[in-house]
Amino acid sequence: MKPSLQLRLSQHLALTPQLQQSIRLLQLSTLELQQEVEQALTENPLLERENDWIESPLRVAADGSVNLQSAPAPAPAEPQGNGEARADGAADDDSYGDSGNGDDYGSSDWSLDDFARRPQGDEDEKTPMQLREAEPTLREYLMEQLTPLKISARDKGLAIFLIESLDDDGYLSASLEEICTELPEELEFEIEEVHAILTLLQSFDPPGVGARNAAECLALQLRRLTHPQRELALNIVTNHLELLAVRDYTRLKKALQVDEAALKSAHELIRSLAPYPGHAYSRPEADFVVPDVFVRKGGGGWIAQLNPDVMPRLRINDMYAQILRGAKGESGTAGLQQKLQEARWLIKNIQQRFDKILRVSQAIVERQKNFFSHGEIAMRPLVLREIADTLGLHESTISRVTTNKYMATPMGTFELKYFFGSHVSTETGGAASSTAIRALIKQLIGAEDPRNPLSDSRIAELLGEQGFVVARRTVAKYREALKIPAVNLRKSL
């Protein structure tokens, strides 16, 4: 084959660094965005924080587009409508406009406005988590009870070892034999000694601490009570706990030879006990969610409003901008010029990130407005494509916006993805949100007769009477998702 040269014209999609950064920032959570900004501030001398609080320039126009207007100077009065979306969403241009290669290096034109003023708070006030951390842990509380006891150093050391061996529920999961093998051999502890100190530990508060299983935990608590049915309750937790767990009241009455009234009284006594005595002293990991968007009522409807506290306040460093302006075209400034470009990209991409979050949030609010007034039962079916088509964005963009972004509403704080979901058919040919169906199932079970609880089949029939076509297995799936026990486990005397 003879070698030859050919000219071919073709097109291919190339992601510019600016677009790549925009996509990456869009899918970051609030915490991840803060970390990204901190890293950029460390690495880029052209970038700095804006310390002044400025009113938001972000506005949603009547056609659904978002405009960034020049921000007025801060006024003493509280600004109105900061970072709010008030209109129906409409298609927007998802492009970047200019390429960011202009010569304007002034800091004001490239400042990422704060969109709203931050409320002043009392820094001296302790948070609920700080107050929680001030309370003693289970081990600290047990040590407080052990310290004043006049027992030998050997016994006290063994008691401390047992306290350290408890799990967070207050149980001793290791057997006495295992405890003995873990103790120093030279001390030659016998099982009887370990059992004696464990008995001492089980006399401490909270009642039930140091138990080796659920039956022993409940029995330890019952022995401290005075109740007409205490002995019957002790018999149940010691010998028939498995029957009580499955609510087999018929076999229980037969095994105990008691009437229904006595069994019911003993059951209520057992239910008043704490199966996990250590929980009251546990310190769960902080699981706080900072909302990206607030929803409030106003203007005859519901309005989405950006949370100003999660918005980075960035601008171009004035000093370096002046240096670059004066040294324009000179050699040796290429590095700073690149840093300037990166700073401008970051500021603009963060602006566009919050632009999309606001517009998507408002579109969700307008479609789920009944939810904000009536709760889950009023949730309507919604898919990502519906929002994407309305706003003129790609479905993948909506997915990125709704992942790890949270909305604070009168009904609670939810991830934006919460407002989307599958649907079930109705008899009229329409569709109902699976979230609304789950709420209905929860409502039906909450109103059931505990002596004759509703089966999954009966719940499906009741939903059918309301016009929802739901199979029994679907009811079971939704019930399990709600962590509601099966019908036999919900039955009571």
UniProtKB/Swiss-Prot annotation:
Residues 383-402 bind DNA. One of its GO terms (molecular function) is DNA binding. Residues 68-131 are annotated as: Disordered. Keywords: DNA-binding, DNA-directed RNA polymerase, Nucleotidyltransferase, Sigma factor, Transcription, Transcription regulation, Transferase. InterPro entries: RNA_pol_sigma_54, RNA_pol_sigma_54_core-bd, RNA_pol_sigma_54_DNA-bd, RpoN_core-bd_sf. Sigma factors are initiation factors that promote the attachment of RNA polymerase to specific initiation sites and are then released. Belongs to the sigma-54 factor family. This is RNA polymerase sigma-54 factor. The gene is rpoN.
